[in-house]
């Protein structure tokens, strides 16, 4: 499938046909969740944020709305929805959850579960100044084009890691966020 003619219906049919398996390896790990907000349009969008530069962790980085699970969250999905509401004012009740991707281990010790949801196109985002410097939308067809991501092999704490790098307009998309977008593309059958 070519990404330039990817409709939301195409994405949904492929996502539902290729449901990801959930990991059961969650013992002794701090849990977090991010929302992958797909904007419902004929040519869908992917909503991303740029973290505030004064944040202690990952300042200025492009990210999905999300964060640590807290005691008020009934589930990982609830955590992703709560964080998206806190960070960019997406009302939880307007998000249509379509599934999750396998969890990803973060460099900060969290196991992060990406939650995929569809949001209406007419939302008015309000970035929390404490956490978010900018909110932007990238065409989903562009985000899922695997050739836009370039690998960088690094060593961290004596282990080899591959991170992915990309640019969209003036936004540098890399690390866990780029890796999650790539996994989403691979999960719906995009070819490298």
Swiss-Prot record:
Required cofactor names: Mn(2+); Mg(2+)
One Pfam family matching this protein: NUDIX
CDD domains, alphabetized: NUDIX_CoAse_Nudt7 (cd03426)
Residues binding Mg(2+): 83, 87
Chain ranges of the Nudix hydrolase domain: 29-160
Residue interval(s) of motif Nudix box: 67-89
PROSITE patterns recorded: NUDIX, NUDIX_COA
Gene3D superfamilies assigned: Nucleoside Triphosphate Pyrophosphohydrolase
GO biological process assignments: nucleoside diphosphate metabolic process
Keyword Magnesium in annotation: yes
InterPro entries linked: CoAse, NUDIX_hydrolase-like_dom_sf, NUDIX_hydrolase_dom, NUDIX_hydrolase_NudL_CS, Nudix_NudL
Protein family according to the UniProt entry: Belongs to the Nudix hydrolase family. PCD1 subfamily.
Role, per record: Probably mediates the hydrolysis of some nucleoside diphosphate derivatives.
Protein name: Uncharacterized Nudix hydrolase NudL
Organism of origin: Enterobacter sp. (strain 638)
